[in-house]
């Protein structure tokens, strides 16, 4: 038959009879196919359909996109890939039915078709030439009048738009109509299709319904389809045929084409010369190439390999297409725009999506429609399995890859799989998740939160250690693994103290605590950065130094760190046991039972600090600066957990890392701690700025809800601290010396803590701490400065520094309050301290108080001369320098003690800050009951040795340290009642920026919790955890400066109005909690914007 067909096709013309469907049929001749009955067509057609189904012939319309390629290339493709009409099996019958309805004889049909073929070829050619009706053929020559007349004479118009039943009298009109119609309207529903059929063929509607494939039909050859891209590709065949256009149709089925190649190819489906059958499935084909390619699907053979990359394919055409990705060749262009692609199917998809082409893929669950099969599958998958992208590290599941990538970067920033290719993540296939998705999501969140909460006790150490390591590693702590580990310990401890504060003040759930902790960390970072670029710079410098000193002092601090870690765990467990117990323990342990707390706090802080402060005294001093920056991360962890204890300790440790913290930790194990104690005081004086920021953050973050209470407590604490500073301060100095006199120090530290906590903040804030009132750290710093500076020198710098940083007027006013309140506080503190000491079994209260009083007397006289604000600020900015230079001096004696101080510094920073001048020691007790008490002891011991070497350094360091200590200790130690007091005090002392900073930080904490609660909480928490150390310190210096200015302005407004005023929108609030929540809404945005900017940089 093929030969016969070929002969006829080459012979041309009207030699065929009415039944001659094999020859080249003219447009109207081919419809003689209706002479064949359906019965005759059934069997062969079924064979072809089966073959098409198995070979994928229906699926492929590659030839639509391979028009410009050689036919031999098509030979390599599956049987149906190159057949434009393979998927349209009933096109011929439909047309033949139309012809049936026509009364014209065969001869008229032939003549008409011949004339049309002569007249139309060019226009059709052009019309299809533009890849098809997407392109606008504006310059198509109109049909000749003769053609139009003949078209009119024929009852059936040659150009018919089936979707809308429009019949064009000329090709130009038809092309214009299609252009106006737009591809989107060519996809018509079945009802419209039936109507169109009814109009086109009255008598043969039934037959047409059976074989019709869609609403779009070619009037030249009877080709019909429901896909516009197929139709436009089909028109190209007419254009290629040109004047010699011939229509080839199958004698067995309704297939018709103008391509002899495709017609012969189609006939092989009915009359295969040899059938290749697959032994593993039902596939068969008469073409060996197709069979071979199919078999490769079973064997996995991919012989076609790319020489430029690992790509390989089982088909040559796939490799050819792939090579275009390397060459950049994009030969396929959209006819309506400048879009180009390396594959025609991409252009087709583009046309459907962008140019409103048909979107045959409809979502069964919603109204979503698309022409992109991959998008369709993804979309449907979202209905079936909303969260199919699993995190390889945790149980998190995302609905989109981008969400999983965001989760992974934020939650697992230091994970070894950080560079994981998310595109390779396997989808979930558990139906369980589909049914229980909402519950699972909630459960996952609760589990994560519970895990975080559990981490606070035992798992949190590992968890936070990992997180802290991530933060530390991601930033400056990467250099030393030990540092990250210690920092992890510190963070664990901070989180524990934060949990206590949260429990005491907010009584929030454990889940909220975990989220709050994370958010607090974020806020601490933000507020820390806001507190001052100076502090950040110092912290950055200190971090670097810290890492070095940590590596050096690791040997010294490691044993202490271990014991401290155990103690920290115990403390964490105890803290979790009960909020009340935590509050009581914090107060009592800080006030009365400081020996035990000193050990756990010092040890815990030592663990947290040792890595940072552990190095030598010189390195300790360096660590101080280093820690100033690490403390932000560690402060986030430690200050949050240790805000009550470590918060002050941490600041102290950050700067004390150089002296104080290390000494605290060292003191318990070694007497050189005394030197460290002096250094701790100096560190307090020096570190307070970083600590201030850190503690302020801690106070704000940990005390966020507790902020008012903490502020009050801080103030109360600061008051006793000042009292202690003037009188008990000396006692505290002796207790720190008590590392030599361990008991007195404990007594003093704990009593000052009690006095400070119980007594109003105003008392403490009044002298130096009042400036700190909102942030007792300043007062504490000033006392610590006095102590560290050896008495007058140290203490003098702190008071001026506190007032300048926070507010000089406050510092001026507080002294009067201090004098009065200190006396009352001294008495109450003594009674409390005695009780605590008796309970703890420390040295008699009297001895410790005598020591503290003597020390505080010495300290009080030196701090009396306050430094100007400028000096304080310069010192704050120069703290690093002072610490470094001071460290140089301290290095010789302090190196040993410095390692211990580093250990103590993190948990004991707050205590050191409070104890630094012994005002700070008592203030530390107030601010960080446990940590401060421990720090106080070490400070007294270390102060004896360090007072000599660090007098100058302490004077300088204390200036910076006071500010930071004043800010942080206040909030950490303040109880709810103290919060109220603090609010009142803060209103009076709003002028002090540190207090405002603390409030802002605490507000930031609340804001993160509120903003990121619910679904976003995990991500936001993770972001804060992952990004605390990622670049906040480096990238936030500027925002910190601006935030400081804003905070100062806000404080001034607050002082005037007596309430909290938003620095961003000037809204005023009566309560600190409301203000903090509101302010955090502004700062959270800044936080993430800054982080994003950092990521881009």
Curated annotation (Swiss-Prot):
Keywords: Cytoplasm, Deafness, Disease variant, Metal-binding, Non-syndromic deafness, Nucleus, Phosphoprotein, Repeat, Repressor, Transcription, Transcription regulation, Ubl conjugation, Zinc, Zinc-finger. Residues 86-96 have a biased composition (Acidic residues). It is found in: Nucleus; Cytoplasm. This is RE1-silencing transcription factor. Changing residue 918 to Y: Does not change transcriptional repression activity. The C2H2-type zinc finger 5 is required for nuclear localization. Residues 83-103, 127-159, 452-642, 774-837, 853-938, 961-1049 are annotated as: Disordered. Residues 452-479, 495-504, 559-570, 803-836 have a biased composition (Basic and acidic residues). It comes from the Eukaryota. O-glycosylated. The lineage of its organism: Eukaryota, Metazoa, Chordata, Craniata, Vertebrata. Residues 43-57 are annotated as: Interaction with SIN3B.
């Amino acid at each position: 038959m093929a030969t016969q067909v070929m002969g006829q096709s080459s012979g041309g013309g009207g030699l065929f009879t009415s039944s001659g469907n094999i020859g080249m049929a003219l447009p109207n001749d081919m419809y003689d196919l209706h002479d064949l009955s359906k019965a005759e067509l059934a069997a062969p057609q079924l064979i072809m359909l089966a073959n098409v189904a198995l070979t994928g012939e229906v699926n492929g319309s590659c030839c639509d996109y391979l028009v410009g390629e050689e036919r031999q290339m098509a030979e390599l493709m599956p049987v149906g890939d190159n057949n434009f009409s393979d998927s349209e099996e009933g096109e011929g019958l439909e047309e033949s039915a139309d012809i049936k309805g026509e009364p014209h004889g065969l001869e008229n049909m032939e003549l008409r078709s011949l004339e049309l073929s002569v007249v139309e070829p060019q226009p059709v050619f052009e019309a299809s030439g533009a890849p098809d009706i997407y392109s606008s053929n504006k310059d198509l020559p109109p049909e000749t009048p003769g053609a139009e007349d003949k078209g009119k004479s024929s009852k059936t118009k040659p150009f018919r738009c089936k979707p809308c039943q429009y019949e064009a009298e000329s090709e130009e009109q038809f092309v214009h109509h299609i252009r106006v119609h737009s591809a989107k309207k060519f996809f018509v529903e079945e009802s419209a299709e039936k109507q169109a059929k009814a109009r086109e063929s009255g008598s043969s509607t039934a037959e047409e319904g059976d074989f019709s494939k869609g609403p779009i039909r070619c009037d030249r050859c009877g080709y019909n389809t429901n896909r516009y891209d197929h139709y436009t590709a089909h028109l190209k065949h007419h254009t290629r045929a040109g004047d010699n256009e011939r229509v080839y149709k199958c004698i067995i089925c309704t297939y018709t084409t103008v391509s002899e190649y495709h017609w012969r190819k189609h006939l092989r489906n009915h009359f295969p010369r040899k059938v290749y059958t697959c032994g593993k499935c039902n596939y068969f084909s008469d073409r060996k190439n197709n069979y071979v390619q199919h078999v490769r699907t079973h064997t996995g053979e991919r012989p076609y390999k790319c020489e430029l990359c690992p790509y390989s394919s089982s088909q040559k055409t796939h490799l050819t297409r792939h090579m275009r990705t390397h060459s950049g060749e994009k030969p396929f262009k959209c006819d309506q725009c400048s879009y180009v692609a390396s594959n025609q199917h991409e252009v087709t998809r583009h046309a459907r999506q962008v140019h409103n082409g048909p979107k045959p893929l409809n979502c069964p669950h919603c109204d979503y429609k698309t022409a992109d099969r991959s998008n369709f599958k993804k979309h449907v998958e979202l209905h079936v399995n909303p969260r199919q992208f699993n995190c390889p590290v945790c149980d998190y599941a995302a609905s989109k890859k981008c969400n999983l990538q965001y989760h992974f970067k934020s939650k697992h920033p230091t994970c070894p799989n950080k560079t994981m290719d998310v595109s390779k993540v396997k989808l979930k296939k558990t139906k369980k998740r589909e049914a229980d998705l909402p519950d699972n999501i909630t459960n996952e969140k609760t589990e994560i939160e519970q895990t975080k909460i559990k981490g606070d006790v035992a798992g949190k150490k590992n968890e936070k250690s990992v997180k802290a390591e991530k933060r530390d590693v991601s930033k400056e702590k990467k250099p030393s693994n030990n540092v990250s580990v210690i920092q992890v310990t510190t963070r664990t401890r901070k989180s524990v103290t934060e949990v206590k504060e949260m429990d005491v003040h907010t009584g929030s759930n454990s889940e909220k605590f975990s989220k709050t902790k994370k958010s607090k960390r974020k806020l601490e970072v933000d507020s820390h950065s806001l507190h001052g670029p100076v502090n950040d710079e110092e912290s950055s410098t200190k971090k670097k130094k810290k890492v070095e000193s940590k590596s050096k002092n690791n040997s010294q601090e490691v044993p202490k760190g271990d014991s401290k870690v155990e103690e920290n765990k115990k403390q964490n467990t105890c803290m979790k046991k009960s909020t009340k117990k935590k509050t009581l323990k914090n107060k009592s342990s800080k006030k009365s039972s400081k020996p035990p707390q000193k050990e756990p706090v010092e040890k815990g802080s030592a663990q947290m600090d040792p890595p940072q402060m552990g190095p030598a005294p010189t390195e300790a001093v360096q660590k101080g600066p280093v820690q100033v920056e690490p403390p932000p991360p560690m402060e986030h962890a430690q200050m949050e957990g240790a805000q009550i204890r470590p918060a002050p300790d941490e600041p102290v440790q950050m700067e004390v890392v150089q002296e104080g913290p290390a000494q605290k930790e060292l003191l318990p194990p070694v007497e050189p701690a005394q030197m460290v104690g002096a250094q701790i005081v100096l560190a307090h004086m020096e570190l307070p700025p970083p600590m201030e920021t850190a503690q302020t953050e801690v106070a704000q973050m940990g005390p966020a809800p507790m902020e008012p209470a903490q502020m009050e407590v801080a103030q109360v604490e600061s008051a006793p601290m000042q009292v202690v500073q003037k009188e008990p301060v000396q006692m505290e100095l002796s207790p720190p010396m008590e590392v030599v006199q361990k008991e007195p120090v404990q007594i003093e530290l704990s009593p000052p803590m009690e006095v400070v906590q119980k007594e109003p903040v105003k008392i403490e804030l009044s002298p130096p701490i009042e400036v700190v009132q909102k942030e007792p750290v300043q007062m504490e710093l000033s006392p610590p400065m006095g102590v560290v500076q050896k008495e007058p020198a140290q203490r003098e710098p702190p008071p001026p520094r506190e007032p300048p940083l926070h507010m000089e007027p406050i510092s001026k006013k507080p002294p009067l309050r201090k004098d009065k309140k200190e006396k009352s506080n001294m008495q109450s503190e003594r009674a409390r301290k005695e009780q605590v000491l008796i309970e703890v079994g420390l040295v008699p209260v009297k001895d410790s108080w005598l020591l503290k009083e003597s020390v505080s007397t010495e300290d009080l006289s030196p701090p009396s001369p306050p430094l100007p604000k400028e000096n304080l600020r310069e010192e704050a900015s120069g703290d690093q320098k002072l610490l470094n230079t001071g460290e140089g001096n301290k290095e010789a004696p302090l190196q040993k003690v410095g390692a211990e101080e580093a250990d103590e510094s993190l948990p004991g920073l707050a205590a050191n800050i409070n104890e630094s001048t012994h005002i700070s020691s008592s203030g530390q007790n107030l601010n960080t009951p446990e940590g401060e008490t421990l720090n106080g002891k070490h400070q007294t011991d270390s102060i004896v040795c360090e007072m000599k070497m660090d007098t100058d350094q302490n004077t300088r360091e204390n200036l910076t340290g006071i500010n930071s200590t004043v800010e942080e200790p206040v909030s950490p130690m303040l109880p709810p009642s103290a919060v109220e007091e603090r609010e009142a005090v803060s209103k009076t002392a709003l002028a002090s920026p540190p207090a405002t900073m603390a409030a802002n930080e605490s507000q930031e904490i609340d804001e993160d919790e509120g903003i990121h609660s619910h679904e976003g909480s995990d991500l936001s928490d993770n972001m804060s955890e992952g990004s605390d150390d990622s670049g906040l310190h480096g990238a936030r210096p500027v925002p910190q400066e601006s935030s400081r200015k804003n905070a100062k302005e806000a404080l001034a407004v607050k002082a005037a109005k007596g309430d909290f005023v938003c620095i961003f929108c000037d809204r005023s609030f009566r309560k600190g909690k409301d203000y903090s929540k509101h302010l955090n809404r502004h700062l959270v945005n800044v936080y993430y914007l800054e982080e994003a900017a950092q990521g881009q940089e």
